[in-house]
Amino acid sequence: MKRILIVGAGGQIGSELTTYLRKIYGNDNVVATDVRECKQLAESGPFEVMNALDANAMAEMVSRQKIDSIFNLVALLSAVGEAKPQTAWQVNIGALMNSLEVARQYNCALFTPSSIGAFGPSSPKDKTPQDTVMRPTTMYGVCKVTGEMLGDYYHSRFGVDTRSVRFPGLISNVTLPGGGTTDYAVEIYYEAIRSGRFTCPVPGDVYMDMMYMPDALRACVELMEADPTKLVHRNSFNIASMSFTPEIIYAEIKKRLPDFTMDYDVDPVKKAIAESWPNSLD
């Protein structure tokens, strides 16, 4: 990777990945874009406002900036996707299709993340294997499975260098998430410090896979730098770090903050989503 375009740089992953890539490849070689202004990203390197649903704008950007690698991070997350399923499809798949087409036209490598949300209730719950039944019950999951298949199609049909991992919930001390089912695993730490109490929106006994953000960023770079001839899978690799429940986090925080309390106000949508996902990935 020499000239990198990040599409959706203002989100949870993109905001930190931009900084991470700039440290490795140089500030001027990582072009960040988002549909909204991102002052912090603009201060450290090239940033432009761009709507990922505008195919012509993306093509012009790649051509003008001489991009060789694209990171498409545009997504409406799981809970938001259930509230706005049509919008989620239009945004998630629209941005991906534009990225794939531009990558095909300009011979770019393309990274676009999948998720544990690609699995569903009929997938094995524990140590979910790489290749298994994938019948998600959320629009977010449907988009992720579709994205994996489109990535495979563009690689086999057009030779596009597509790559992807299935991210679990991502835990960051830098950027707050928004609209996801695993958000509680970040919010609980902030509330523990801010107010000493937390109201959890998912049941206390539900396991979900999680990963610390710096590990996720490193995985992105290692995959994109890997020898393409040695990649068994392209869309998409399982990637795992840890699996826990809200009660497990609560107990660990209590060891540091004995006065910390947690209660529950379970969101039925998030509950259904969480219970449809794997407990752990293989």
Positions of the model-derived regions?
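SDR active-site strand-loop-helix element
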Residues: 7, 33, 70-74, 110-116, ...
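NAD(P)-dependent short-chain dehydrogenase/reductase
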Residues: 152-207, 213-217
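C-terminal substrate-binding subdomain of Rossmann-fold SDR/epimerase-dehydratase oxidoreductases
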Residues: 201-203, 209-282
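N-terminal Rossmann NAD(P)H-binding glycine-rich loop of SDR-like oxidoreductase domains
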Residues: 4-24
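Short-chain dehydrogenase/reductase
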Residues: 89, 132, 137-148, 178-186, ...
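NAD(P)H-binding glycine-rich loop region in Rossmannoid oxidoreductase-like domains
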Residues: 52-91
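Conserved Rossmann-fold NAD(P)-dependent oxidoreductase catalytic core, especially the SDR/UDP-sugar
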Residues: 97-139
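Glycine-rich NAD(P)-binding loop of the Rossmann-fold in SDR/ketoreductase-type enzymes
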Residues: 50-53, 83, 87-98, 134, ...
